[in-house]
Structure formats: structure tokens, C-alpha cells
């Protein structure tokens, strides 16, 4: 044992112990040499749960999914060099979707920086503005002052990651050789000088009385709508419904709002706006005086188009942090306060009998018409087209299941075909940067928290992250993946690019012709190809009770998919005309 080893051990033990005391329970480690002391010290901690992922990009998204589902900070550890750069996509997503990650990167000591040393690159501010905070840690020392410094940075990292708006934090650790700390006796049970832990307390932003009264006055007796985008706060679901009923306002609820699947059905929850707002002819009948938006912007483009054309209205955006989430430049009042506080205080201060029943009835009539058409069409459809897959999942998913939703077509089909249901289904997706990469790993991370967990994903997105399946094999994780295989980029068939057939397939269709049954075998998963509704039901039922990885593949046709969607929209348009 050398003094260097003791210094290294004491310094890192102080830091890691403080992370745990501040609320960290899991660490995702990407193997490497320079990160050896941090990896060993985290593995030695009696409370910290360790996952080892050899693919850094997968590791980043696994941590993202776990932090998203658990709502607590998760640690990521990588060695020096390009390994750390592979975390970038997950960090960008975490920043935009406000997920608390603590990224630890090992680095060469200062004397080996910028001198051509192997596996060394500039890691200072590596993630730029995509992290909330960056610290280049001091070289290890074990004086009282430096041990306080180490533990202080552990507390501070968790505090910054968890403070509203939540997000990723990066700490870079320069480490000298030798890199092996002392594990006997355990650095977490050895006697010696102890340092107190920092207790962190959080508060909620609230509004002053005059602002509350102004908002109540603006909303009393007015035609208004709530727009609720992706927001993962179960505590606001019932208060939102209660306030909407009192005001007589509809709630336009994105699939990721939680309001379509929180265990109850309510007429005020509008789930088919994406379908009926495609018809601009009805917009004049639905012009509000007030809009109050919670969460990020919903996925629906027809909703976005409708909101953009509104004028001379009061448009509130509610955000508990300092973010400015107004991509359509419509906000008239930006409210930075806790959502539950606002709903409760408005409910308390809002006069009774102020609702305009005809206003809510108009919205529910359009919604019910569109919903009945969608449900009827899906009941009468015997083939496994893409909308039918979502409709069947809505029926087949067990109560309290988790559903991770891929980007591109899957999230949009869930918006259209997954209407309100009286089951509790936890829906998750990466809707910060909206990328199709890392979705498998994110779902696996979320599966640590929610069971049973299902993933609805397209073939290209699945291909992007097949490496992530190693975690399912290694840790015997329970995940059912439903691959909608339309052999390429299905969403492009709905976009203007489809009007240029000369290069469409080569540049946008991008057929891969991959056989995914081999991916299932490679990672010890069960494979099922569903060619009919009955086969899909059988596969989902088996997977629900099977512990391990299940891959259910449904092959569809991109061109038929577009035609099927258009036929449904045409029928909804016809049904809406009958209401006028």
C-alpha cells in the first residue's frame, strides 16, 4: 500500500458516499482503464446498484431511461477519450427532457493533457451547453479540506441535477497512476474521521396573491382549453380533471400527459384532437378566449397548427422552472410555478357555476364522433395494419403496465389510436430531442422501475440500438418489444419528400431488409412474428407472463399504411360534417 493509493481511496470514497447520501441509488459503468478507481469504489459501495454496459451510447440511454422512470439521479461513468463522447446523444436528450443524470468522466492528469498522450483529448466542457453544470475536479488529496471538497461536490452535483429544471451534470476526474484503490478494509466501513453529510431541501415555485387573482379573473366565465403535453407528474392528473370540470373546459391531452391512461375516463379529456383538428373548417367553432398549456408541446401537428392561428386570446404557459417552452411564439403570460400549486389554488379561488356548457359540449361532440369512427374502423379491421397494432396494444396491455414509445411513427400512431382507457398504463418516450436512437436502451432502463414493460418501436429505430439488447441478456431483464417493421422510414411517406419519387427510396425510404429473428437469438430472447390479430394477442399474452426478453415483429407495408391513415382521416372528416 502506498500513500497515493490511500489518498485516492479516501478522496473518491468521500465523493461517492456523498452521492449516495444525497439520493443516488444506481450507477451505469462503461468499462475502461482510467476510470478504474471510480468503478471499483462504486462497486464496493454496499448500497449502490451497479450496471455495466460495454457500449457507451447504450449506457447513456439506459441511464436516461432509468432516471426518467425513477425520477431520481443516476450516475454514468466512462473512461477517458472518445468513450465519453458516446454519451452525448443521451445527454442532449436528458437536457431537453429535464432528466437528472450525473456524468463522471475519468481523464488524464494535467501534465498529460495537450501533449499527445494516448487516449487523451480535451474533455473540459465536453458536453457544452447540454449540461447544467461542469466541474473539472481537483487531483485527489486526502487532507481534511480536500475531503470536504470531494463530498461537497458530490452533494452539489445531485442538487444541481435535481433542482428545477432537472438535468444532467458533468464532473471530470483527472487521475494519476497507479489506479487501484484500497478495498480491504472497505473504505465505507473503515473507522476514521467522519464528515457530516449535506441535507438538501427543495421547494416549489408559487405565485403571489395578485397574480393568482388576475389569472382567476381572466378564466372566470370564459371559453378556455387546457393543453397538456408530455409531463410526468401523476400528482396533477386528478386536480387537472377536477378544475376542468369546474370551468367547463376541455383538456387536450397528449399521450405522454398521463391523462389518457391514469385509471379513469373523463369526458373533459379530449383524446382525438389530432384527428378532428386536421379539419380547418371546424376551427372557427372551437376558438377559445383562454389557453393554458402544461408540459412540453404535444406531438400533434394539427394541434400546433390550430394553436398558431389563434389570435387575440390569453395564452398561458405553465413551467415550474426557468425554461421558455413556447416554440409557436404564442405565449402572453409565462407562469413559472409548481403545476399542482396552481391547479389547487385556482380550484380554491374559482367561483362556482362559471362554466359555459355549450362550449365543452362542442368539443366532446367532435371528440366522440372522431373516437367512435376510429374505434369502429379498428374493430372492423382484420389485418395488422399499423393503427390496428396500437389499438390492439391498448386492449391487451395489462393494468399498471409500462409502455415505452418510439419516435417517428409509433408516437404519432399512439396519439391517434390510443384513446382514453380506464387502465393505468405508464407511457414514456424520449421527446426532448425526439431522436430514434437509444430507444431500446431507454426502455430497458425504464424496465428496472416499471413491470411489465413494453416497447413499441419502428424497425429503423430498433436497428439503431440493437447493441442495447446486451443489457437484457446480461441482467435477465424483462422487456417485450413490438417492432413495427415497415422496412424503412415510414414517416417520410407522409412528408413532402414523398412527392419526389426519383430519390425517395434511396434517401428516405432506406430499406434495410433485416431479419430481426437473428437479433432475438443473438441476445437470448424469444421471437414471435405476428401475422394476424390472433397471433399478436397470443404473442403479447405469452410475453406478459414470460420473464425475459421477447421480440414480437409485425411486418407492414409503408404505402398501404399511408393509404389506411388517409382513409381514416377522410371518414372522420365526413363524420364531422354531419355535426354542422
UniProtKB/Swiss-Prot annotation:
| Keyword tags | Magnesium, Manganese, Menaquinone biosynthesis, Metal-binding, Thiamine pyrophosphate, Transferase
Q: Which GO terms describe its biological process?
A: menaquinone biosynthetic process
- One of its Pfam families is TPP_enzyme_N
Q: Which free-text remark accompanies the cofactor?
A: Binds 1 thiamine pyrophosphate per subunit.
The superkingdom listed in its UniProt entry is Bacteria
Pathway assignment reads: Quinol/quinone metabolism; 1,4-dihydroxy-2-naphthoate biosynthesis; 1,4-dihydroxy-2-naphthoate from chorismate: step 2/7; Quinol/quinone metabolism; menaquinone biosynthesis
Q: Which GO terms describe its molecular function?
A: 2-succinyl-5-enolpyruvyl-6-hydroxy-3-cyclohexene-1-carboxylic-acid synthase activity; magnesium ion binding; manganese ion binding; thiamine pyrophosphate binding
Q: InterPro entries, per this entry?
A: DHS-like_NAD/FAD-binding_dom (IPR029035), MenaQ_synth_MenD (IPR004433), MenD_middle (IPR032264), THDP-binding (IPR029061), Thiamin_PyroP_enz_TPP-bd_dom (IPR012001), TPP_enzyme_TPP-bd (IPR011766)
* Function of the protein: Catalyzes the thiamine diphosphate-dependent decarboxylation of 2-oxoglutarate and the subsequent addition of the resulting succinic semialdehyde-thiamine pyrophosphate anion to isochorismate to yield 2-succinyl-5-enolpyruvyl-6-hydroxy-3-cyclohexene-1-carboxylate (SEPHCHC).
Report the family membership: Belongs to the TPP enzyme family. MenD subfamily.
UniProt name for this protein = 2-succinyl-5-enolpyruvyl-6-hydroxy-3-cyclohexene-1-carboxylate synthase
UniProt source species: Listeria welshimeri serovar 6b (strain ATCC 35897 / DSM 20650 / CCUG 15529 / CIP 8149 / NCTC 11857 / SLCC 5334 / V8)
Q: What is the lineage of its organism?
A: Bacteria, Bacillati, Bacillota, Bacilli, Bacillales
Corresponding gene?
menD
Amino acid at each position: 500500500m502506498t500513500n497515493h493509493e490511500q489518498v485516492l481511496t479516501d478522496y473518491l470514497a468521500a465523493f461517492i458516499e456523498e452521492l449516495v447520501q444525497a439520493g443516488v441509488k444506481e450507477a451505469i459503468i462503461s468499462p475502461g482503464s482510467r476510470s478504474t478507481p471510480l468503478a471499483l469504489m462504486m462497486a464496493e459501495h454496499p448500497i449502490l446498484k451497479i450496471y455495466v454496459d460495454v457500449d457507451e451510447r447504450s449506457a447513456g440511454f439506459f441511464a436516461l431511461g432509468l432516471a426518467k422512470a425513477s425520477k431520481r439521479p443516476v450516475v454514468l461513468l466512462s473512461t477517458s477519450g472518445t468513450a465519453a463522447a458516446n454519451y452525448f446523444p443521451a445527454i442532449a436528450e436528458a437536457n431537453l427532457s429535464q432528466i437528472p443524470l450525473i456524468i463522471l468522466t475519468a481523464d488524464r492528469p494535467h501534465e498529460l493533457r495537450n501533449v499527445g498522450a494516448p487516449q487523451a483529448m480535451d474533455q473540459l466542457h465536453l458536453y457544452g451547453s447540454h449540461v447544467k453544470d461542469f466541474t473539472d475536479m481537483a487531483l485527489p488529496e486526502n487532507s481534511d479540506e480536500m475531503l470536504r471538497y470531494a463530498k461537497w461536490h458530490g452533494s452539489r452535483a445531485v442538487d444541481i441535477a435535481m433542482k428545477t429544471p432537472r438535468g444532467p451534470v458533468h464532473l471530470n476526474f483527472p487521475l494519476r497512476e497507479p489506479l487501484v484503490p484500497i478495498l480491504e478494509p472497505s473504505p465505507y466501513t473503515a473507522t476514521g474521521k467522519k464528515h457530516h453529510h449535506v441535507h438538501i431541501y427543495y421547494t416549489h415555485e408559487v405565485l403571489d396573491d395578485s397574480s393568482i387573482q388576475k389569472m382567476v379573473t381572466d378564466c372566470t366565465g370564459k371559453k378556455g382549453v387546457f393543453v397538456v403535453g408530455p409531463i410526468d407528474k401523476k400528482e396533477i392528473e386528478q386536480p387537472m380533471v377536477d378544475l376542468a370540470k369546474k370551468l367547463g373546459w376541455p383538456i387536450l391531452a397528449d399521450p405522454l400527459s398521463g391523462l389518457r391512461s391514469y385509471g379513469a375516463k373523463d369526458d373533459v379529456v379530449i383524446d382525438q384532437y389530432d384527428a378532428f383538428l386536421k379539419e380547418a373548417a371546424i376551427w372557427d367553432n372551437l376558438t377559445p378566449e383562454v389557453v393554458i398549456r402544461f408540459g412540453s408541446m404535444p406531438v400533434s401537428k394539427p394541434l400546433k397548427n390550430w394553436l398558431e392561428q389563434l389570435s387575440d386570446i390569453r395564452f398561458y404557459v405553465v413551467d415550474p422552472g426557468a425554461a421558455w417552452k413556447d416554440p409557436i411564439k404564442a405565449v402572453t403570460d409565462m407562469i413559472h410555478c409548481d403545476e399542482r400549486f396552481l391547479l389547487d389554488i385556482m380550484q380554491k379561488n374559482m367561483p362556482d357555476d362559471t362554466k359555459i356548457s355549450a362550449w365543452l359540449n362542442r368539443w366532446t361532440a367532435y371528440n366522440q364522433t372522431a373516437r367512435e369512427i376510429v374505434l369502429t374502423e379498428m374493430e372492423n379491421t382484420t389485418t395488422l395494419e399499423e393503427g390496428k397494432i396500437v389499438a390492439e396494444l391498448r386492449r391487451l396491455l395489462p393494468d399498471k403496465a409500462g409502455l415505452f414509445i418510439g419516435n417517428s411513427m409509433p408516437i404519432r400512431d399512439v396519439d391517434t389510436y390510443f384513446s382514453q382507457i380506464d387502465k393505468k398504463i405508464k407511457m414514456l418516450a424520449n421527446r426532448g430531442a425526439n431522436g430514434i436512437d437509444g430507444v431500446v436502451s431507454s426502455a430497458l432502463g425504464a424496465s428496472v422501475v416499471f413491470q411489465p414493460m413494453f416497447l413499441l418501436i419502428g424497425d429503423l429505430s430498433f436497428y439503431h440500438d440493437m447493441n442495447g439488447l446486451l443489457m437484457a441478456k446480461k441482467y435477465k431483464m424483462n422487456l417485450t418489444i413490438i417492432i413495427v417493421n415497415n422496412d424503412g422510414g415510414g414517416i417520410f411517406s407522409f412528408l413532402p419528400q414523398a412527392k419526389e419519387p426519383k430519390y425517395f427510396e434511396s434517401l428516405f425510404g432506406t430499406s434495410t431488409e433485416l431479419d430481426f429473428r437473428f437479433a432475438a437469438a443473438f441476445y437470448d430472447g424469444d421471437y414471435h412474428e405476428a401475422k394476424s390479430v390472433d397471433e399478436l394477442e397470443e404473442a403479447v399474452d405469452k410475453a406478459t407472463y414470460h420473464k425475459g426478453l421477447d421480440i414480437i415483429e409485425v411486418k407492414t407495408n409503408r404505402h398501404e399504411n399511408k393509404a389506411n391513415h388517409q382513409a381514416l382521416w377522410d371518414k372522420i372528416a365526413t363524420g364531422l360534417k354531419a355535426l354542422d
